[in-house]
Amino acid sequence: MSKTYKDNTPISRQKFMEELRRYQKGSVSRRHFLAVTGLGMATAVMAGAVPGLRPRKTWAAGEIGDRVILATWPNYHDPKNFEKFTEMTGANVQVNVFGSNEEMLAKLQAGGSGWDVFVPTNYTITTYVGEKLIEPLDLAKIPNYEAGAFDPRFSDAGTVDGTVFAVPKNWGTTGYVVNTKHTGGKKLSTWKEFWDLTKTEFSGRTMVHDYQLTTIGNALKYFGYSFNSVDPKELADAETLLLEVKPHLYAINSDYQPPMRNGDAWMSMAWTGDGKQLHTDIPEIEYVLGKEGGEIWSDYFAIPNGAPHRDAGYALINFLLDPAINAKEVLTHGYPVADARTNKMLPKELLEDPILYPAKDLLDALEFGAAATLTDPNRAELLARFKSA
């Protein structure tokens, strides 16, 4: 049975402190932190003793209030920028980390998220607009956003029926990372190799996302189908493959960097920035875009309807879109940005990095996620069956 991490393994003090620092930076969710450290029900007791488990210190309120709550993805920001924002405004940035767009949507649909800003992916925005979950943006409050500076491929999805609901953050691709010391030096290049290795030499060492769009989409690519397919027969083929590989997985989890770094996992579905971070730190870990195709995506900043600290939300978006601040973000997380102003500030070697900016033939084979996949019941039910098998 797949798992998040190795079960019942005692955690060392060093590992505990590493995970605590990741939690405090917003790199991982509270649920992840409690599961990995084994605190569980002890949280209430520990809250008084462990900084980061209790509410953070209230900052002196300025014009925008004392806090801003951001829902975002793992390893997707420079914590030093948040510290600078707090110094400038008095608003403390509190980060909620999520592993899928479905989680974000469900949280907003349930009401009372408490978020002021969140980071949805391109294909979800029309759903948020249709369900009146996000508000039209007042661009006068985001003077650092200059529409003309952004590549329209990665900014157009934020505008629905002529109204801007979201502004671009980063873009990237979905491929996989593989530790080549376990391939005998062989270079991988396809999704077929990913799935076939998982069933054989990499049994027990592969991770897939806890995210239906990418896990189902990349299983569909094994058969040459569209990444976004909702065709019942094609989904049935993908389910057969997923159920076949399920016993061979190390984990179903969207936070794959720790096991790839410590060697528990040898291969995992991955996003661009994680691929770049891992390859930089451990050169034998390579990022692969399957020749069959897959996903290209763009993420956005948006403000939920009813945001409790709305002015602080606008201030944070505007701050992060300052080209100099944005450049620091890119240098930290490794995801490309569509802002030409920011790109002028980045090192040439970064702009020429094949992980971040793949060859045209690889890019041309990729698909943007389709809105239909977010709410398609067949895909949601398939993922549920896969996870419970």
What is the predicted function of each stretch?
Residues S113-V117, E135-L139, N144-Y176, G204-T206:
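A structural signal for short loop-to-beta-strand junctions that line the ligand-binding cleft
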Residues W59-T127:
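Early extracytoplasmic/lumenal segment of secretory-pathway proteins
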